[in-house]
Amino acid sequence: MLAACGGAAAPAPEQAATASTPSHPASAVTSAAPSVTVISTPAPTARPIAAVLERIDPAKLNDHMVALASFGSRDARNPNHAKAVSYLKEQLGAIPGVVIQTHRAAYNGIPLENIFALIDPLTPPPATGWVMICAHYDSISNRSSGWNPTITAAPGADDNGTGTAALLEYARVLAQERASLMQRIVLAFFDGEELFFKGSAAYLGSLPDPNPYAAVINIDMVGFNPIADRLDLIWYTNGSARLRDRVIAANDRYQIGVDPLIPQLATSGATILDAAPFGLAGIPSIAVVERYGESDTTYPGNDAFHTVNDTPDKVTNNRLWLKAAKLTLATALELAR
C-alpha cells in the first residue's frame, strides 16, 4: 500500500494580514565629536543551529496537530476547511515579526487558499535566494467507504497535520532568529495538494521569471512508523542533488538520528507532493515523508492513510516527527544564514 500524500517578491501573494512590519535596526555607528571614541555595537551572535533545533517544542507540535484534526475535515470541498484557514491565520498572526500573505486559486471551481508566513532578516531581504519550507494543510479520506468530500470526515492527523504543525512551530522559533538570517524564509501552507498539488502548482505559475526561490523543502506525513525512525528523501532532477546531499549531511552534522534516510529520485509529477512542481521546474527541491512506496522491512504501511481513521491517536512515532521537524529546519537555516 502506498503511504504518501497525494503548482517576487512573488507576484504578491495577496496580502491577507500583516503582523508587525519587519524592523530595520538603527545604524550602530553614529556621528560624534572628534574627541569622542565611537564603538560600534557588535552584531548579535547567531544562536548555533543545534541550539535552535532544541527550541522546537514537541508539546506545541502535538497541540497544533490535534487542533487541525479536530475540524473534522480540511478537504477544500468541505465547509470545515474554512476553520483550518482561520486557525492558521490566527496562530501566525499572534507571532510578532511574522508577515502573513495569501495566494488564491481555483481548480474545477473549487477555491483554494495558500497561506504564507514570511520570516525576514532585520534588513530588507534580497529579491532572490529565498528558502521555502512547505506543507499542505488540506486533507482527504478517499480510501474510506462511501466517501463524499463535502461531508465525510478527513481528520488528516498524520497526513498532513504533522507537517502543518511543524510549520506553525517553525514560525514561532524562527521569529526569534531573524537577526541571524541573510535570506527570507517562506513558510508555505499549501492547499489542494490532495487534488494533485493544485495549490502549489498554481502558486508556482504565478511567480516571476526569475523566480525568487533558491530551494524548496517539503515536510509531509511524518508521524507514523512503529518499526524505525525512517524517512524517504524525495529529490527532483539533478538540479536538486546538492540540496539532497545537504539534507543528508545535516542529519549527520546535528546528530538528528533519522535512520534510515533513503533518497528517492522522482522523475515525474506522479509523486504527489508539493515539492514536485517546483523540482520539476528546475528549482532545487526535496521532500521528506515517512514512506513513499510500498511497505518494506522498515515501514509496515499506514492503514489510516487517506481514511476517516487518520486521527491523532494514529500519530504514534513522536520521535520520528520531531526528527523530521529538526532535519527540515536545520537544512533551511543553513541555506538562509
Residue locations for each model-derived region?
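C-terminal motif of bacterial Sec signal peptides marking the signal peptidase cleavage site
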Residues: 2-4
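Bacterial signal peptide processing site
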Residues: 6-9
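N-terminal hydrophobic or amphipathic helices/low-complexity stretches enriched
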Residues: 26-79, 128, 297
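Second-shell loop/turn segments in exported
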Residues: 47-55, 69-80, 101-106, 148-160, ...
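Structural recognition of the beta-strand scaffold that forms the well-ordered cores
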Residues: 60-69, 101-102, 116-118, 130-134, ...
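A non-catalytic alpha/beta surface segment that caps or lines the substrate-entry region
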Residues: 63-122, 261
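Acidic/histidine-rich catalytic neighborhood of metal-dependent amide-processing enzymes
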Residues: 111, 151-239, 246
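Active-site-adjacent substrate-binding region
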Residues: 226-337
